[in-house]
């Protein structure tokens, strides 16, 4: 097996995603003194079908925007003279700056409680959760960026308890992706028994454990130990078996930050973002020094303050982050089966969310973005470390800019393709006097996508990134980015890509079958012969609640439901047992 230099190709991939076209607009002023405005033809027809009549509005001539070049895929062309009122977003002091920047860039207005009615907003995005009363009072045209009840997944002790319950209910074969875990202080006796039993079996060989505070994040309060006398804890902690054989790149430990968006729990709908972050420790992995956090912890909040952060490190280069696409390019350069790894990650995400999904209360018009932290060991097995609530969207480096700005863009596209499809939404907006409907349509655009489920995303996962980025551009239009591409090109062409990635990974990689062709983006071969797929779908069309979710929005790919059986098992209540059976079938197929 031999490697190849991925620096230039990887750099061109990263920069390719930044080459955008800024839309040009011209201003048309109607010449008639008494100008009459009619709703857009497509929208008016749908509102008439819903039994809502909108009288023509008369008034002063209104400047209108005529598009020369579309920044997004459009559901339909807007007629000249259509009134476009911007959507409104609401924030608090915790709202990430990149979210506000992206929304303003897309033409949204920021909510001003001094000048606007209390309900005159479309999206409320903040870091903290919402009270149930806030969920209950949300209007049909509004969206919240959190779902109630999801902290059961993001507290480390709760996650461990729920996954332990799922393992007990459905067997260990599916739930082998979490390290052996004990919740302190309740499991203290069990941990002590396990520790000394293992110590007796291993003899002089060391075993390693990691102790984490249940509620803290960003690597705070973490202790790694081998000797029991070093084990100290107070309050709520978890103790896990430390993965002592991580996949090393340039002898540095890394983990993956995978972004997952759940657009609804009833019915359950899960999307996985096919780009993400790879976070590196900034000092070389060394089990003989467990106190060196820069060698054992990959949290960027820790490593960006380390002495080696600015250095050009072997293979990794400058800083402590790669894009996920660069990481998979590195694996492919050594003939590692990255598609199989993606399947395992998708399955892990589904099984993890299934652990809490039945107990999550119903709430309309909300979504949840999770950050899954996953470690790959030297056998290419993915391990779930934790799930993060409100994953950090700060822009600390050029890699953050590349990933997180487009992530926010794609979340907005995803939510306004799926979140506003509920039956009667447009009619309700018009009835309540919300005049933001047209702007919602122009911002989120439309996506030429089938009305049915795309493919079995776990048994046939496509490569999201390959050497030809044009595939991505054909599938989804690239939206304008605020940061100038030339500025980022200068950053990305420097130290971040200074070194060749020609080093054998510290692993035993599974080779790709010679008979397995490399797949390109979105081979959406539907599994449903009983569903007639339409050639074009407008996000504004009133639809029934049994409609299959959109297969993709930007880099978000639907992973659940993944076939007709799981679609049915998630509609009228959540049939977890049936879903588990379908997942087990896929595992059996992959192993056969």
From Swiss-Prot:
<dbReference type="GO" id="GO:0036211">
    <property type="term" value="P:protein modification process"/>
</dbReference>
<feature type="compositionally biased region" description="Polar residues">
    <location>
        <begin position="7"/>
        <end position="23"/>
    </location>
</feature>
<keyword id="KW-0479">Metal-binding</keyword>
<dbReference type="InterPro" id="IPR004344">
    <property type="entry name" value="TTL/TTLL_fam"/>
</dbReference>
<dbReference type="GO" id="GO:0046872">
    <property type="term" value="F:metal ion binding"/>
</dbReference>
<comment type="function">
    <text>Probable tubulin polyglutamylase that generates side chains of glutamate on the gamma-carboxyl group of specific glutamate residues within the C-terminal tail of target proteins. Similar to TTLL1, may acquire enzymatic activity only in complex with other proteins as it is most likely lacking domains important for autonomous activity. Probably involved in the side-chain initiation step of the polyglutamylation reaction rather than the elongation step.</text>
</comment>
<feature type="binding site">
    <location>
        <position position="388"/>
    </location>
    <ligand>
        <name>Mg(2+) 2</name>
    </ligand>
</feature>
<feature type="region of interest" description="Disordered">
    <location>
        <begin position="1"/>
        <end position="23"/>
    </location>
</feature>
<dbReference type="Pfam" id="PF03133">
    <property type="entry name" value="TTL"/>
</dbReference>
<dbReference type="GO" id="GO:0000226">
    <property type="term" value="P:microtubule cytoskeleton organization"/>
</dbReference>
<feature type="binding site">
    <location>
        <position position="218"/>
    </location>
    <ligand>
        <name>a protein</name>
    </ligand>
</feature>
<comment type="similarity">
    <text>Belongs to the tubulin--tyrosine ligase family.</text>
</comment>
<feature type="binding site">
    <location>
        <position position="373"/>
    </location>
    <ligand>
        <name>Mg(2+) 1</name>
    </ligand>
</feature>
<dbReference type="GO" id="GO:0070740">
    <property type="term" value="F:tubulin-glutamic acid ligase activity"/>
</dbReference>
<feature type="binding site">
    <location>
        <position position="279"/>
    </location>
    <ligand>
        <name>L-glutamate</name>
    </ligand>
</feature>
<dbReference type="GO" id="GO:0005524">
    <property type="term" value="F:ATP binding"/>
</dbReference>
<feature type="binding site">
    <location>
        <begin position="298"/>
        <end position="299"/>
    </location>
    <ligand>
        <name>ATP</name>
    </ligand>
</feature>
<keyword id="KW-0436">Ligase</keyword>
<feature type="site" description="Essential for specifying initiation versus elongation step of the polyglutamylase activity">
    <location>
        <position position="218"/>
    </location>
</feature>
<feature type="binding site">
    <location>
        <position position="321"/>
    </location>
    <ligand>
        <name>L-glutamate</name>
    </ligand>
</feature>
<feature type="region of interest" description="Disordered">
    <location>
        <begin position="51"/>
        <end position="77"/>
    </location>
</feature>
<feature type="binding site">
    <location>
        <position position="212"/>
    </location>
    <ligand>
        <name>ATP</name>
    </ligand>
</feature>
<feature type="binding site">
    <location>
        <position position="386"/>
    </location>
    <ligand>
        <name>Mg(2+) 1</name>
    </ligand>
</feature>
<dbReference type="GO" id="GO:0015631">
    <property type="term" value="F:tubulin binding"/>
</dbReference>
<feature type="binding site">
    <location>
        <position position="386"/>
    </location>
    <ligand>
        <name>Mg(2+) 2</name>
    </ligand>
</feature>
<feature type="binding site">
    <location>
        <begin position="253"/>
        <end position="255"/>
    </location>
    <ligand>
        <name>ATP</name>
    </ligand>
</feature>
<feature type="binding site">
    <location>
        <position position="301"/>
    </location>
    <ligand>
        <name>L-glutamate</name>
    </ligand>
</feature>
<feature type="domain" description="TTL">
    <location>
        <begin position="84"/>
        <end position="427"/>
    </location>
</feature>
<keyword id="KW-0460">Magnesium</keyword>
<keyword id="KW-0067">ATP-binding</keyword>
<feature type="binding site">
    <location>
        <begin position="240"/>
        <end position="243"/>
    </location>
    <ligand>
        <name>ATP</name>
    </ligand>
</feature>
<keyword id="KW-0547">Nucleotide-binding</keyword>
<dbReference type="GO" id="GO:0036064">
    <property type="term" value="C:ciliary basal body"/>
</dbReference>
<feature type="binding site">
    <location>
        <begin position="218"/>
        <end position="219"/>
    </location>
    <ligand>
        <name>ATP</name>
    </ligand>
</feature>
<protein>
    <recommendedName>
        <fullName>Probable tubulin polyglutamylase TTLL2</fullName>
        <ecNumber>6.-.-.-</ecNumber>
    </recommendedName>
</protein>
<feature type="binding site">
    <location>
        <position position="404"/>
    </location>
    <ligand>
        <name>L-glutamate</name>
    </ligand>
</feature>
């Amino acid at each position: 097996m031999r490697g190849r230099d991925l620096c230039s190709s990887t750099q061109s991939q990263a920069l390719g995603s930044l080459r955008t076209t800024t839309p040009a607009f011209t201003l048309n002023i109607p010449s008639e003194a008494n100008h009459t405005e009619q709703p857009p033809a497509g929208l008016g027809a749908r509102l008439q079908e819903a039994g809502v009549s909108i009288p023509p509005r008369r008034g002063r001539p209104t400047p209108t925007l005529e598009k020369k070049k579309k920044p997004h895929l459009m559901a339909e062309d807007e007629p000249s003279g259509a009134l476009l009122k911007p959507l409104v977003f609401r924030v608090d002091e915790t709202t990430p700056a990149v979210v506000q920047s992206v929304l303003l860039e897309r033409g949204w207005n920021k909510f001003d409680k001094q000048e606007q009615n209390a309900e005159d907003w479309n999206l409320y995005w903040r870091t903290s959760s919402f009270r149930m009363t806030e969920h209950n009072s949300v209007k049909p045209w509004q969206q919240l960026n959190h779902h109630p009840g999801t902290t059961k997944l993001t507290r480390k002790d709760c996650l461990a308890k729920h996954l332990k319950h799922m393992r007990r209910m459905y067997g260990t074969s599916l739930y082998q992706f979490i390290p052996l875990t004990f919740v302190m202080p309740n499991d203290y006796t069990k941990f002590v028994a396990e520790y000394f039993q293992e110590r007796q079996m291993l003899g002089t060989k060391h075993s390693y454990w990691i102790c984490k505070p249940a509620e803290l994040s960003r690597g705070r309060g973490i202790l790694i130990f081998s000797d029991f006398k070093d084990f100290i804890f107070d309050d709520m902690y978890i103790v896990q078996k430390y993965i002592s054989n991580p996949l090393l790149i340039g002898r540095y430990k890394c983990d993956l930050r995978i972004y997952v968006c759940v657009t609804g729990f009833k019915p359950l709908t899960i999307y996985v973002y096919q780009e993400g972050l790879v976070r590196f420790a900034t000092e070389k992995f060394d089990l003989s020094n467990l106190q060196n956090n820069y060698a054992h912890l990959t949290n960027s909040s820790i490593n960006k303050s380390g002495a080696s952060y600015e250095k050009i490190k072997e293979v990794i280069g400058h800083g402590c982050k790669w894009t996920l696409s660069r990481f998979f390019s590195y694996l492919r350069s050594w003939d590692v089966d990255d598609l199989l790894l993606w399947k395992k990650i998708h399955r892990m995400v589904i099984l993890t969310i299934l652990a809490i999904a039945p107990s999550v209360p119903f709430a309309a018009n909300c979504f949840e973005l999770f950050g899954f932290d996953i470690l790959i060991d030297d056998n290419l097995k993915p391990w779930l470390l934790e799930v993060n609530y409100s994953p950090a969207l700060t822009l600390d480096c050029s890699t953050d800019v590349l990933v997180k700005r487009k992530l926010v863009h794609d979340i907005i596209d995803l939510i306004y393709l799926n979140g506003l499809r509920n039956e009667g939404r447009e009619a309700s907006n018009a009835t309540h006097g919300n005049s933001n409907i047209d702007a919602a349509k122009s911002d989120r655009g439309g996506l030429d996508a089938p009305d049915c489920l795309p493919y079995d995303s776990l048994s046939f996962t496509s490569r999201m990134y390959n050497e030809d980025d044009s595939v991505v551009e054909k599938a989804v239009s690239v939206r304008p980015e605020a940061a100038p591409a030339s500025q980022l090109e200068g950053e990305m062409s420097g130290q971040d890509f200074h070194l060749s990635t020609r080093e054998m990974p510290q692993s035993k990689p599974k080779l790709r079958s010679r008979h397995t062709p490399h797949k390109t983006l979105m081979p959406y071969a539907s599994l449903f012969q009983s569903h007639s797929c339409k050639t074009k779908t407008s996000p504004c069309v009133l639809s029934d609640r049994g409609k299959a979710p959109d297969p993709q929005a930007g880099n978000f790919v639907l992973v659940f439901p993944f076939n007709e059986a799981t679609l049915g098992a998630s509609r009228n209540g959540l049939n977890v047992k049936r879903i588990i059976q379908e997942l087990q079938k896929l595992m059996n197929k992959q192993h056969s």
